[in-house]
From Swiss-Prot:
The keyword Transmembrane applies. Keywords: Disulfide bond, Host cell membrane, Host membrane, Membrane, Secreted, Signal, Toxin, Transmembrane, Transmembrane beta strand, Virulence. The lineage of its organism: Bacteria, Pseudomonadati, Pseudomonadota, Gammaproteobacteria, Aeromonadales. The record marks K374, E390 as: Important for heptamerization. Secreted, cytolytic toxin that forms pores in host membranes after proteolytic removal of a C-terminal propeptide, leading to destruction of the membrane permeability barrier and host cell death. The pores are formed by transmembrane beta-strands and are approximately 3 nm in diameter. This is Aerolysin. It comes from Aeromonas hydrophila. GO terms for cellular component: extracellular region; host cell plasma membrane; membrane.
Length: 493
């Protein structure tokens, strides 16, 4: 009995694993094909569509069928044409709806970015919207494939040629040239492609710099004093420690005014170049030009463990330095914008999901860049084209049937191609730091050396003290703040 129970449990587990392995996959209507080879028979590298798959894309299949057509599915099922309201039931037919055994999902390829040279905002926009090969033609063909009429000028028979580009407020309008007259229904009503709502987002990973000019360290101050041992025994178990805060002053210039429009999506840290230590941060969602200089403070320390003979003193020297660095820099900013198509849809076929045939005037806006919403996202609509009712805008399956999958993939890849603009300028920084604490040869104390000086630092009452003049105001003017000297017992004697 126990073995039977275990066997039954194994079958249940095996069945569950098989069910997981055979999870439903999307059926892309543009890859369906009708074979007239008999019930349940498909051509090479195709298989019959089953009942569940046909149900998931029922409206698409029925839309490709004749009024009273009946076509076969897998396992003895059939689907009936629009005259039968697309009913799916057991039955027989002489032809079969089939699907590839190795379907192509047909993702939109991602092309390398189109780089626009640095310039001010109008320069960058102008270069983009006047680029015939990389912008005007791809967007014109998008409008044409979606069913917009007259996407070309009067002096050319081809889509996207003889196009005029005009300034429109803060944006641009691309439209076929209307000079010289034309023939055809409403041929003067050219489709307009409006480009507007430009935005620029800094790409921190794109940082590059030119030749670095870095000065050798420059001595700005030498502090000299004494470590004094008033006791009758040598002192060697103490650390002399210099602590200070130093500021690094930095500035950047921006070559063009586009930097005022560029924002940082996330908190941004300036990359380190050379030996100058910086900790520059620009907050998220700030203009790149909002912070063109400042100062960062770092706390530093230096230590030495001197050996001072009995009733002796040794000279102590601390040298303070500064260093400069400068270089030209470049970042890239990701350019995003709205692409609005305005015109009337062709009566002979258009991709609006209801496929109107009364030549309606139609406006639709796509966002080229970061995702905003479903209605404006080409990639979202394309990826979800296999779900009837989810995409209530454009019928991308229709565009594939009319123009071919590879044609649509190529066109949409060019429309969605990332665009980047150069952000250039010059960066400079100055930092301060202390060199090592230097110790000289011991000198015997004079007979009156027990008289303490006001600026001495005691070594925990053990006879070791420091006599080193520190002018806080002077040191602050040199970029060194909160300067202190201390004598403490060594931790690892």
């Amino acid at each position: 009995m126990q073995k039977i129970k275990l066997t039954g449990l194994s079958l249940i587990i095996s069945g569950l694993l098989m069910a997981q392995a055979q999870a439903a996959e999307p059926v892309y209507p543009d890859q369906l094909r009708l074979f007239s080879l008999g019930q349940g028979v498909c051509g090479d590298k195709y298989r019959p569509v089953n009942r569940e798959e046909a149900q998931s894309v029922k409206s698409n299949i029925v839309g490709m069928m004749g009024q009273w057509q009946i076509s076969g599915l897998a396992n003895g099922w059939v689907i009936m044409g629009p005259g039968y309201n697309g009913e799916i039931k057991p039955g027989t037919a002489s032809n079969t709806w089939c699907y590839p055994t190795n379907p192509v999902t047909g993702e939109i390829p991602t092309l390398s970015a189109l780089d626009i040279p640095d310039g001010d905002e109008v320069d960058v926009q102008w270069r983009l919207v006047h680029d015939s090969a990389n912008f005007i033609k791809p967007t014109s063909y998008l409008a044409h494939y979606l069913g917009y009429a007259w996407v070309g000028g009067n002096h050319s028979q081809y889509v996207g040629e003889d196009m005029d580009v005009t300034r429109d407020g803060d944006g641009w309008v691309i439209r076929g040239n209307n000079d010289g007259g034309c023939d055809g229904y409403r041929c003067g009503d050219k489709t307009a492609i409006k480009v507007s709502n430009f935005a620029y987002n800094l790409d921190p990973d794109s940082f590059k710099h030119g030749d670095v000019t870095q000065s050798d360290r420059q001595l700005v101050k030498t502090v000299v004093g004494w470590a004094v041992n008033d006791s009758d025994t040598p002192q060697s178990g103490y650390d002399v420690t210099l602590r200070y805060d130093t500021a690094t002053n930095w500035s950047k210039t921006n070559t063009y005014g586009l930097s005022e429009k560029v924002t940082t999506k996330n908190k941004f840290k300036w990359p380190l170049v050379g030996e100058t230590e910086l900790s520059i941060e620009i907050a998220a969602n700030q203009s790149w030009a909002s912070q063109n200089g400042g100062s960062t403070t770092t706390s530093l320390s230096q230590s030495v463990r001197p050996t001072v003979p009995a009733r002796s003193k040794i000279p102590v020297k601390i040298e303070l330095y500064k260093a400069d660095i400068s270089y030209p820099y470049e970042f890239k900013a990701d350019v995003s914008y709205d692409l609005t198509l305005s015109g009337f849809l062709r009566w002979g076929g258009n991709a609006w999901y209801t496929h109107p045939d009364n030549r309606p005037n139609w406006n639709h806006t796509f966002v080229i860049g970061p995702y905003k919403d479903k209605a404006s996202s080409i990639r979202y609509q394309w990826d979800k084209r296999y779900i009837p009712g989810e995409v209530k805008w454009w019928d991308w399956n229709w565009t594939i049937q009319q123009n071919g999958l590879s044609t649509m993939q190529n066109n949409l890849a060019r429309v969605l191609r990332p665009v980047r603009a150069g952000i250039t300028g010059d960066f400079s920084a100055e930092s301060q730091f202390a060199g090592n604490i230097e110790i000289g040869a011991p000198v015997p104390l004079a007979a009156d050396s027990k008289v303490r000086r006001a600026r001495s630092v005691d070594g925990a009452g053990q006879g070791l003290r420091l006599e080193i003049p520190l002018d806080a105001q002077e040191l602050s003017g040199l970029g060194f703040n909160n300067v202190s000297l201390s004598v403490t017992p060594a931790a690892n004697q």
